[in-house]
């Protein structure tokens, strides 16, 4: 990452930060603004947790966008006006020239053109200035009218809500709708859509086309509403304002900011931070709100109880589409037979969604209030939005962008928590199946066919039998001798799966078309839930959000259209009971092909995070084709004073701390670790969080401590808490841990696992973590199928490009090493949350004392490593005492 600019080199630009920004926030905002302004294609920004990163992103990017729009309005609009004026003039000249024109007039026409050009050049300056002002004023007045229109709609809505609240009408309407929705469906609703194989081509993209058709219908109804609006009704606006709103849709700025993050809470935080800000308008002497839209999936935005309460996102999607095809349809969606009422609500929703900064929950409440679907209606505001937030999957999948009609060309893409981007891309395009899963599916299919066989048309009967046969062949393959003897990570060629069977007679492409058209996965799941046999017996933890058939469908799609950047390979799935089962995996191994489409279309892609190191993975595997001079790297320090954090690498305590995999059963080292922690607990106040590389290692260590006096001695000093693999216990564990720290003088110690919920989703501020201790280096299992397959792929790529075997192995090891260091940075970055916070970080392993490992720590951590930690005279306990004896440390 690049070094920080000197104070004298920074700009004095006003970023409209709602508070007095810290120096590092100004550095961050300067760097991001310059990245956008100077034509960089990629920006990589690291800002530690607790440094106000989100506000810095908002203020710098929105300041740039308003500056850009202001310049766009002054220059581009003027250019468009000149072109339009010249076109009109030329059209008039061409019309005149056609009267009595003959070949002898050609030279005269050329002379006339020259004369016209001279006339344009000779126009007085005041005429040119007046013309320029008229062009700019036209756009300014459009914006002013639209802002006034949004104000009027917002105020009218608030008055109506208050009136309805007083009359208690809203609840009555919603209860009636909910009662209608929860009525029991007849058995016919579980039947798959009729299927005729001769028409299968038209059904391949059925879901996507239906989404696009519905969006088009909403858009048509909105336009119709604007044209026919007669000013009546409780939410009426005058014709001039409606016309201004319609005109504004053709006058949007071509550049938008797309902000994406991994979790719902992070996106809501973005909304709340955006509410704090206010920026200069795109025109002088004008008030302009920030026009913001949060986009989400049906799971987040659906307000139909019958649909949104289904299990799994894909099941919700299919239920929505299925409901639209019924005679009554969905009560919240446009109905052509009642277009005036529905389009009015849809249009009002689109306006209200832009009138204020709202989060996803606000849009759900707004849709319920207006009795219109938020998922579809919110799209109608996209054209005029300046800032759009959305979860990773909606941005990273081209099909999702198409369904939402998202045009990311020339836009600013900001990816927050970017260290998650690799895992997200991989999971979106990867799937695994097991024999137990297939057995479960076959059993469910037999139950389903026994019930509905006589009601199925021939196309469904034939294809369900083929699907059952296909699942049986896949199950046999997973139980074959080949599968049992295969090494983890070994590649599987698609043709091998059906070799020696009649499976090759089943056309996978046609089967995929059938699955898309019939919605059998959704129908099957619905019926299984109704009769109460969803779980037909497996101890292995598969994706519970994709029950019964959905993962099988995804796997068959990968089998039908495998990406060249992905591969099939063998792996294992381990159950809670200690057993394991063979799995057949498909995994996207090269994410750059998927990401390239986004990079190519966007004006600039900004990757932000609290822990971006090591950064080489981004440049090597996410955008390798981007030249280094088009990549801006920035890393800032922390807002805390330098003496509020100390980092101590510890390589030995009565022997080396060496937590290599081959020493995972070193009982002596486990005991020395316990004795070290006891001495630390005697010094550190309040809470201590200890990160250990795996649940198994944590269990082994605690077992040894309990067999000796270590655990009881540790518990006397600080109450011991252990992270459980069960997520259901997380909330109660944290609550009890916090309660003990806040009510008992001795404090507590939390034994957590790297990669668990504690290491990624929880921030340990203030007394919750006065010390964070990392035990060993958390390398992932080198022999897992996914790691083996990924490293093999990297080595193949290096050799294909002319590299040696040694270079290939070095490159794949660097990837493996970086996985470990990312986990380290992510875990130890949870302790500092604000400017007055303080903590000590202890890294227990001799490898943390090496320059190579320290070079991959986050910059703000690296800068605070204690001096001379490898010297024989270095005493980590003395350093810890010094840290907490500093006056500020004596109180919270």
From Swiss-Prot:
It is found in: Nucleus. It is an enzyme of class 5 (isomerase). One of its GO terms (molecular function) is ATP binding. Residues 103-124 have a biased composition (Acidic residues). Its cofactor is [4Fe-4S] cluster. Residues 11-474 form the Helicase ATP-binding domain. Gene3D superfamilies: P-loop containing nucleotide triphosphate hydrolases. The keyword S-adenosyl-L-methionine does not apply. GO terms for biological process: establishment of sister chromatid cohesion; interstrand cross-link repair; mitotic G1 DNA damage checkpoint signaling; mitotic sister chromatid cohesion. Residues 80-126 are annotated as: Disordered. A motif (DEAH box) lies at residues 416-419. ATP-dependent DNA helicase important for chromosome transmission and normal cell cycle progression in G(2)/M. May have a role in changing DNA topology to allow the loading of proteins involved in maintaining sister chromatid cohesion in the vicinity of the centromeres. Has a specific role in chromosome segregation during meiosis II. This is ATP-dependent DNA helicase CHL1. It comes from Lodderomyces elongisporus (strain ATCC 11503 / CBS 2605 / JCM 1781 / NBRC 1676 / NRRL YB-4239).
């Amino acid at each position: 990452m690049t070094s920080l600019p000197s104070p004298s080199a920074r700009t004095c630009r006003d970023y409209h930060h709602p508070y007095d920004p810290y120096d590092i926030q100004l550095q961050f905002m300067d760097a991001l603004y310059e990245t956008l302004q100077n034509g960089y294609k990629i920006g990589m920004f690291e800002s530690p947790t607790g440094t106000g990163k989100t506000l810095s992103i908002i203020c710098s990017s929105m300041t740039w966008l308003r500056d850009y729009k202001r310049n766009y309005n002054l220059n581009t609009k003027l250019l468009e006006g000149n072109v339009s004026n010249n076109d009109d003039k030329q059209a008039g000249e061409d019309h005149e020239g056609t009267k009595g024109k003959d070949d002898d007039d050609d030279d005269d026409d050329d002379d006339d053109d020259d004369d016209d050009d001279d006339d344009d050049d000779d126009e007085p300056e005041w005429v040119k200035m007046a013309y320029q002002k008229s062009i700019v004023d036209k756009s300014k007045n459009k914006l002013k009218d639209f802002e006034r229109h949004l104000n009027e709609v917002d105020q009218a809505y608030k008055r109506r809500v208050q009136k309805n609240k007083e009359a208690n009408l809203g609840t009555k309407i919603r209860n009636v709708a909910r009662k209608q929705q929860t009525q029991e469906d007849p058995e016919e609703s579980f039947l798959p859509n009729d299927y005729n194989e001769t028409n299968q081509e038209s059904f391949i993209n059925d879901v996507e086309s239906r989404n696009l058709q519905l969006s088009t219908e909403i858009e048509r109804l909105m336009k119709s509403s604007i044209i026919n609006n007669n000013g009546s009704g409780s939410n009426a606006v005058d014709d001039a304002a409606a016309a201004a709103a319609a005109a504004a849709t053709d006058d949007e700025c071509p550049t938008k900011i797309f902000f994406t993050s991994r979790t719902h809470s992070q996106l809501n935080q973005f909304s709340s931070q955006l509410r704090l800000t206010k920026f200069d308008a795109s025109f002088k002497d004008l008030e302009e709100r920030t026009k913001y839209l949060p986009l989400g999936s049906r799971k987040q935005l659906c307000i139909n109880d019958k649909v949104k309460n289904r299990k799994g996102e894909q099941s919700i999607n299919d239920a929505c589409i299925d409901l639209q095809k019924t005679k009554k349809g969905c009560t919240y969606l446009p109905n052509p037979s009642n277009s005036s009422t529905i389009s009015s609500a849809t249009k009002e929703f689109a306006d209200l969604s832009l009138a204020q900064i709202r989060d996803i929950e606000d849009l759900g409440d707004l849709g319920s209030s207006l009795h219109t679907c938020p998922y579809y209606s919110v799209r109608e505001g996209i054209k005029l939005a300046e800032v759009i937030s959305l979860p990773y999957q909606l941005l990273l999948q081209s099909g999702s962008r198409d369904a939402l009609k998202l045009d990311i060309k020339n836009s600013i893409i900001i990816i927050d928590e970017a260290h998650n981007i690799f895992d997200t891309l991989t999971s979106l395009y990867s799937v695994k199946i097991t024999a137990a899963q297939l057995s479960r599916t076959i059993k469910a299919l037999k139950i389903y066919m026994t019930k509905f066989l006589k009601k199925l048309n021939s196309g469904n009967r034939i294809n369900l039998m083929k699907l059952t046969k296909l699942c049986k062949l896949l199950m046999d393959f997973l139980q074959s001798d080949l599968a049992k003897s295969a090494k983890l990570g070994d590649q599987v060629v698609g043709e091998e799966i059906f070799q020696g069977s009649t499976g090759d007679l089943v056309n996978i492409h046609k089967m995929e078309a059938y699955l898309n058209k019939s919605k059998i996965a959704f129908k099957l799941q619905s019926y299984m839930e109704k009769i109460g046999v969803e779980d037909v017996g497996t101890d292995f933890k598969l994706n519970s959000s994709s029950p019964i058939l959905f993962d099988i469908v995804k796997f068959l799609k990968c089998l039908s259209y495998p990406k060249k950047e992905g591969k099939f390979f063998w792996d294992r799935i381990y159950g809670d009971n200690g057993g394991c089962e063979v799995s057949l995996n498909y995994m996207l191994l090269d994410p750059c092909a998927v990401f390239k489409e986004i990079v190519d279309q966007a004006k600039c892609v900004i990757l932000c995070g609290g822990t971006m190191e090591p950064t080489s993975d981004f440049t090597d595997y996410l955008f390798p084709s981007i030249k280094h001079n088009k990549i801006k790297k920035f890393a800032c320090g922390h807002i805390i004073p330098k003496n509020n954090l100390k980092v101590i690498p510890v390589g030995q305590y009565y022997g080396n701390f060496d937590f290599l995999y081959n020493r995972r059963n070193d009982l002596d080292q486990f005991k020395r670790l316990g004795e070290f922690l006891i001495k630390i607990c005697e010094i550190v106040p309040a809470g201590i969080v200890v990160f250990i590389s795996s649940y198994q290692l944590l269990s082994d260590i605690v077992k040894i401590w309990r067999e000796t006096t270590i655990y009881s001695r540790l518990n006397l000093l600080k109450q011991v808490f252990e992270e459980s693999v069960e997520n259901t216990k997380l909330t109660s564990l944290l609550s009890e841990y916090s309660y003990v720290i806040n009510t008992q003088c001795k404090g507590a110690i939390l034994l957590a696992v790297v990669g668990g919920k504690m290491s990624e989703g929880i921030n340990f501020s203030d007394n919750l973590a006065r010390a964070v201790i990392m035990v060993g280096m958390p390398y992932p299992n080198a022999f897992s199928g996914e790691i083996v397959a990924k490293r093999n792929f990297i080595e193949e790529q290096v050799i294909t490009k002319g590299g040696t075997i040694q270079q290939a192995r070095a490159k794949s090891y660097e990837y493996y090493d970086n996985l470990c260091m990312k986990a380290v940075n992510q875990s130890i970055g949870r302790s500092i949350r604000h400017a007055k916070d303080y903590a000590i970080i202890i890294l227990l392993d001799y490898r943390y004392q090496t320059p190579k490992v320290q070079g991959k720590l986050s910059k703000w951590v690296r800068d605070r490593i204690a001096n001379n930690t490898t010297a024989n005279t270095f005493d980590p306990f003395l350093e810890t005492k010094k840290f907490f004896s500093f006056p500020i440390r004596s109180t919270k």
